[in-house]
Amino acid sequence: MSEKYVFSEKHPGPLVVEGKLTDAERMKTESNFLRGTIAEDLNDGLTGGFKGDNFLLIRFHGMYQQDDRDIRAERAEQKLEPRHAMLLRCRLPGGVMTPQQWLRIDKFAGENTIYGSIRITNRQTFQYHGILKSNVKPVHQMLNSIGLDALATANDMNRNVLCTSNPIESELHQQAYEWAKTISEHLLPRTRAYAEIWMDQEKVATTDEEPILGSTYLPRKFKTTVVVPPQNDVDLHANDLNFVAIADNGRLVGFNVLVGGGLSIAHGDKETYPRTASELGYISIEHTLAIAEAVVTTQRDWGNRTNRKNAKTKYTLERVGVDNFKQEVEARAGVKFEAVRPYEFTERGDRIGWVKGIDNKWHLTLFIENGRILDYPGRPLKTGLAEIAKIHKGDFRLTANQNLIVAGVPARSKAKIDALAREHGLIDDSVSEQRKNSMACVSFPTCPLAMAEAERFLPEFVTKVEGIMQQHGVGDEHIVLRVTGCPNGCGRSMLAEIGLVGKAMGRYNLHLGGNREGTRIPRMYRENINETEILAEIDRLVGLWAQDRLQNEGFGDFVIRTNIIRPVLDPARDFYD
């Protein structure tokens, strides 16, 4: 079951919102193309953090300043500042890296971060948590030495470009991946600030220009995907700009373009809402960059710079109308959209385990719970991946489900890699389908926005859900379950069959009614309830689903069909009904 979203064409709003600009716009204007005084701040040893505008400017360089919230109160009692440390997120379009790159990334995590871990994110890249100020410059230089960077992985730019992790159809995946890289490069900022600050490159006497992003960059974050049906592993409806691959005899010929998805909301603010992306039409492959640029520049010029909570592309589309936005994109690109070509999504989970590609090479998708790579007692995952990287000749591919694919394994190496993976706990045949299809954002202790636990809450919570599933005779099946520690949506709960959104410590809003394909937004079913209440609801509803579902009917479709909850059809207008 997949409802058709209806977007009203009654859009009285202006193309450009007038009014006082947010302070973020002042900060960008005065930053000298994202330089600020970051270089000087690096030399200030009196604080472990960045001061003033630099606190926000470092985000354009791929970093967030955080502190350990588990010890924040204790340090305050001791009259100490919070233990500031940076999160750094790598730019890795399509999630592909070499084993040699992985070994350097692994080494830095072990030697130069507080937590010693690598976190695979659902933005198909990795991030470090706990980088002290003294290690900030070295991490950028390390990434540069292996051909990577952290530019534009945060703040008001086009973020890391996602691409379907499809190891089966190798040729089609490769074409999609090349486009993900090309789009990422095309939409990067042109400022030399990153190279000057982190790579010590000399300042040149030329004026910086940003022909695509503009001198004040975008009004808000902007996310892009390249997706190969029938897999929707990238969760395209969480993204501003999506290129849905259309193939002919296994060759990529063009894309359906969908614009304006996004999941972030603010508790208590009904002017914010999640939204699925709208179809603009089909383009042939040679128009890809022109359309990408036109969508970005239209959002650059029409996006709301007076209110950051209403600044994303989804709100621009609702204000000006999809047709007006589409016509502007066509005019800027010099390209007319054709009618959308047929496509269908059937799943979005990863194929865990070994699969054979059409090129006769093998691909091993490893389930990494929460994407957290660390040596756990009895499960030395981090060591195991390093051992595999030492002998593997293909790629490592990170997925948007926070897993890792050891890709391109020749038949002669399969047994050795399988043995290493099992020896280090990277393959566990007992992992349930439910656990494989559950996901959480990071939340506590490092995220400053966290309201409730997510990553640390999920494993034990899933164990309890597994027990409920077993009790009702559906233990071999799964419900797409997502937990996010606040309403910003990083855990993508707003595209789950069961979505938990953090409200306060130990309390969540319970959303129901998304679907397995990730094309429907779930509606809030219960507000501000604790784990015991959540599990009681899941127990009751899973019991009904197990007893009364149709053949192959997913949980989310069941609760809609049986009127347990109404579907969200026009999120801007009926999400809060």
From Swiss-Prot:
Signal peptide (residue range): none
Residue ranges of coiled coil: none
Record InterPro entries: CysI, NiRdtase/SiRdtase_haem-b_fer, Nit/Sulf_reduc_fer-like_dom_sf, NO2/SO3_Rdtase_4Fe4S_dom, NO2/SO3_Rdtase_4Fe4S_prot, NO2/SO3_Rdtase_4Fe4S_sf, NO2/SO3_Rdtase_FeS/sirohaem_BS
Annotated catalysed reactions: hydrogen sulfide + 3 NADP(+) + 3 H2O = sulfite + 3 NADPH + 4 H(+)
Cofactor(s), names only, from the UniProt record: siroheme; [4Fe-4S] cluster
Manner of cofactor binding, per the entry note: Binds 1 siroheme per subunit.
GO cellular component, one term: sulfite reductase complex (NADPH)
Residue numbers binding [4Fe-4S] cluster: 441, 447, 486, 490
Heme is among the record's keywords: yes
Keyword line: 4Fe-4S, Amino-acid biosynthesis, Cysteine biosynthesis, Heme, Iron, Iron-sulfur, Metal-binding, NADP, Oxidoreductase
Function: Component of the sulfite reductase complex that catalyzes the 6-electron reduction of sulfite to sulfide. This is one of several activities required for the biosynthesis of L-cysteine from sulfate.
NCBIfam families tied to this protein: CysI, PRK13504.1
Subunit architecture: Alpha(8)-beta(8). The alpha component is a flavoprotein, the beta component is a hemoprotein.
Protein name as catalogued: Sulfite reductase [NADPH] hemoprotein beta-component
Gene: cysI
